Amino acid sequence: MRIGLVGAGNIAGRYAAAIAAAGELELAGVTDTASGRAEALAAEHDCVVHPSLAALLADDGVDTVVNLTVPQAHADVTAAALEAGKHVHSEKPLALRHEDARRLVELAADRGVRLSSAPATLLGEAQQTAWKLVREGAIGRVRAVYAEANWDRLERWHPDPRSLYEVGPLVDVGSYPLAILTAMFGPVRRAQAYATTLEPQRTLLDGTPFTPGAPDFVVAVLEHADGVVTRLTASFYVGPCRQRGLELHGDTGSLHLPTWAEADSGLFVQGRGGDYEQQPLLREPFPGIDWARALVDLADAIATGRPHRSSGEHAAHVVEVLEAVEGSVATAAPVDVGSDFARPEPLEWAR
């Protein structure tokens, strides 16, 4: 699968390296609106630099676009790529509004191309092992989940995180555990939430002050179709430490993933009243995050005609959940969620 990157910012290098390491994938081109960024990435990874999005989309040597632009541009860039007949994998969120996300899903179907979206951390070894244990009843019926998405103060390391502070931690990192949990326990049907800004004045590494455009602390209670209740916390104030994991609590025990992000997370199970014990993963895990895993799955799905796992429909549902949380914050009332999606299949080695 020949890939064109749109956006050569903070995570583009990680995608490019992962694509290079995957035999099924080829980095065919890159474009970026910021002068010099695409050229630097292309020099390191030996690919074509396109002077514009239009030029990349006109290149027959690119069949799949990976959208790595800022969240505010995701919907427009993805729509342009789909209109051009390209398959698309978008960084999260698929769009900032559910209406736009649904429109992208419909456009992909109309054009006969695939629409995939991050996050794809569900495909990691630790996450797949946890899902298998849940399906097999290792902790009984799951009724409650604690999900932590605390990402500290991005301005301490990110060169310019202002676009991320405009959408806030709910959208930027809350979508990761949401994608995993909705795959495991089905769509969310109702959301109720609280949010505030803990640190209203921030400063970039170069000394430039800025003000976040969205709350930097969000707590949401989500009711899933399967009856599970999730408490999700997302923050750009609290550091991760032990605050970046998933706890699944069932009738006969509990399961803990210290991090939902990395494929090589530890995995611990506690029987009722017992101690947490580390569990073996189903296979040797990838170290950290495999940024190309959803792309490898997409390439295989296109080649074999099966559904890909990180689907646009699933991503659009996550967008509606995020929108419902924001609506609940604004109204101080519960907000219903109506969309659905076909749940992904476990990976072959995790069935």
Give the positions of each predicted feature.
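Hydrophobic residues in well-ordered beta-strands that form the structural core
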Residues: P51, N67, H89-S90, L115-S117, ...
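Predominantly a Rossmann-like dinucleotide-binding segment in NAD(P)-dependent oxidoreductases
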Residues: T121-T211, A332
